[in-house]
């Protein structure tokens, strides 16, 4: 008979570090809501560990993130049951100011945390409030701004930065706090590839030290996958569905994740499609490099469906309407300045009607500015832009709304009403549409975007994904012949993003011209007919999606090919696959 040594148990207890974060049976109910999201969630995060929170849109990921630094329940009206402990401090019993010394936060919307007039002041603001001496404050501010590549712009106003630039600034503010716990909500959503690499390199250096813990809400799994140690998955009700090591969760539980509609690495999605065609990849690859290696190990592969050729069908399989003779958009010698900074420089581009154009470029390249100028959101010099025979610089708001449906990068920038239903109804009412028709359109849009239960909710109280769906609904409801969308899939889970893109594909197939600004180059490869590449405010390339992806234009503009294109471009044994860029070009049924 063997007697357990009590010292062994004590040693095991001492071997495990005290959790940096402990969440125990946490449920959160927002003011005015009947249900809780998240619901009865329990997990720990150890020092030196990176934990990824996954789950469908609206399941409570961002709410849970806000609870980790005490904003829920101290600042956000919500009822929290259970306990959240950070570095030994019960968040319910501490002030947000005190907790900020232990946990730093990067919000889903970086604009919501900007409070000063220069980048240097913004990053110094947090350390100053810790009553640190001036030299330490300035040292932290400089180090953090250099880490995100913004030190040379330290004297600029945050408002002059691009969306991605403001996101990097928010990350610098969090780094300057030197808190042992870092919580990041979609930190790379608006960043170009170089910015993403910089951010994840900084995060890697933090966790390699062993003292920092990171909780990450992120849809770009292709960027995050190599940093993350463990994945926690919430279901649609906000309950904990799965948790475990990264590969164990993503590869071994992939069928459950597919049913939940969460984001997955592109390499894994490709492997699932190939598995359905009888091509066994074991273990399932999670990165482009792993996918390349797995395919190189195959003795033979069937020919890809399209092999990267230019085709005239959208992702839904519907034939595109042939472009009309008259262009949808003509931009001529367009220069635009913001303050003393030139943003657009000599832009000349003509976009055919019925095109689906992705506008891409690094942060600060001028993508959002060009899109806003085309939509008339910002005024360009008269005579420089023609949109379906209309000069946006001269058109009134009602005429513009009939012609161009616009979606802002930040959904909150376009909300002006106090309920979801009223927000949707505003555009049709502005057009003088009869009340019964307005109500019919609103009801249809609420159903289309699964917002029926939220029709009387204030738009600002929606989750990030719900806000995005509402903003897209307001752009679609007037039936404008041209849609201009800035990062339309931001904040959406995979299922919702797929629904939205299928909707845009369908409208495009019927003749609607679609312009999309995005950093998601796999989305570009799958859905766009053309790519417009901007570099430092100039047109670097414009052509069909296949031709631009086959060229060096993206690399030369400081971008990176989509994950699938990167994986297949490196193949040596299967050259017919090197030009594949889209998931739908892969075989998906049994091969003979």
Regions found by a protein language model. Name each.
Residues 54-56, 360-362:
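The feature captures the beta-strand-to-loop junction immediately N-terminal to the Walker
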Residues 69, 375:
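Helix-to-loop junction immediately C-terminal to a conserved catalytic motif
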Residues 135-153, 436-454:
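Conserved ABC ATPase "signature" region
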Residues 218-219, 518-519:
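H-loop/switch region of ABC-family ATPase nucleotide-binding domains
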């Amino acid at each position: 008979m063997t007697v357990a040594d009590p010292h062994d148990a004590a040693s095991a207890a001492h071997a495990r570090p005290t959790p940096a974060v402990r969440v125990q049976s946490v449920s959160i109910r927002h003011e005015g809501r009947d249900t809780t999201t998240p619901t009865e969630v329990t997990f720990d995060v150890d020092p030196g560990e990176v934990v990824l929170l996954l789950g469908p849109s609206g399941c409570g990921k961002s709410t849970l993130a806000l609870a980790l630094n005490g904003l829920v329940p101290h600042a956000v009206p919500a009822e929290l049951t259970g306990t959240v402990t950070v570095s030994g401090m019960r968040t319910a019993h501490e002030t947000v100011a005190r907790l900020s010394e232990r946990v730093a936060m990067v919000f889903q919307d970086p604009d919501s945390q900007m409070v000063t007039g220069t980048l240097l002041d913004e990053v110094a603001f947090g350390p100053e409030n810790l009553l640190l001496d001036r030299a330490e404050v300035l040292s932290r501010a400089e180090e953090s701004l250099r880490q995100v590549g913004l030190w040379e712009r330290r004297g600029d106003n945050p408002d002059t930065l691009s969306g991605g630039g403001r996101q990097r600034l928010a990350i610098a503010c969090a780094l300057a706090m030197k808190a042992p716990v870092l919580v990041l909500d979609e930190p790379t959503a608006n960043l170009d590839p170089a910015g993403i690499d910089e951010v994840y390199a900084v995060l890697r250096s933090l966790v390699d030290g062993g003292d920092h813990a990171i909780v990450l809400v992120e849809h770009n799994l292709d960027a995050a996958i190599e940093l993350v140690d463990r994945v926690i998955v919430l279901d649609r009700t906000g309950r904990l569905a799965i948790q475990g090591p990264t590969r164990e969760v993503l590869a071994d539980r992939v069928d459950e994740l597919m049913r939940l509609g969460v984001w997955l690495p592109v390499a894994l999605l490709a492997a699932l499609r190939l598995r359905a065609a009888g091509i066994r990849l074991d273990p399932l690859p999670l990165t482009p490099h792993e996918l390349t290696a797995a395919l190189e190990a195959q003795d033979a592969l069937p020919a890809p469906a399209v092999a990267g050729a230019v085709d005239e069908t959208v992702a839904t399989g519907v034939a595109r309407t042939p472009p009309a003779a008259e262009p949808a958009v003509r931009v001529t010698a367009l220069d635009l300045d913001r303050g003393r900074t030139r943003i657009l420089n000599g832009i000349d581009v003509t976009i055919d009607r019925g095109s689906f154009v992705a506008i891409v470029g690094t942060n600060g390249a001028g993508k959002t500015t060009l899109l806003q100028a085309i939509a008339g959101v910002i005024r360009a010099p008269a005579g420089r832009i023609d949109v379906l025979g209309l000069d946006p610089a001269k058109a009134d708001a009602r005429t513009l709304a009939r012609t161009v449906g616009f979606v802002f990068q930040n959904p909150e920038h376009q909300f002006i009403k106090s309920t979801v239903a009223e927000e949707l109804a505003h555009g049709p009412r502005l057009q003088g549409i009869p009340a019964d028709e307005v109500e019919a359109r609103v009801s249809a849009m609420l159903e289309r975007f699964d917002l029926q239960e939220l029709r009387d909710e204030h738009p600002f109280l929606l989750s990030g994904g719900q806000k995005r769906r509402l903003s897209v609904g307001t752009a679609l409801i007037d039936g404008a012949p041209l849609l201009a969308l800035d990062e339309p899939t931001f904040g959406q889970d995979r299922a919702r993003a797929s629904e939205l893109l299928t909707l845009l594909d369908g409208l495009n197939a019927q003749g609607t011209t679609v312009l999309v600004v995005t950093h998601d180059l796999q989305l570009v490869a799958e859905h766009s007919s053309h790519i417009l590449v901007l570099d430092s405010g100039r047109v670097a390339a414009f052509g069909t999606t296949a031709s631009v992806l086959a060229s060096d234009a993206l690399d030369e503009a400081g971008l990176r090919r989509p994950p699938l294109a990167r994986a297949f471009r490196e193949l040596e044994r299967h050259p017919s696959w090197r030009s594949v860029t889209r998931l739908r070009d892969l075989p998906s049924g049994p091969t003979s």
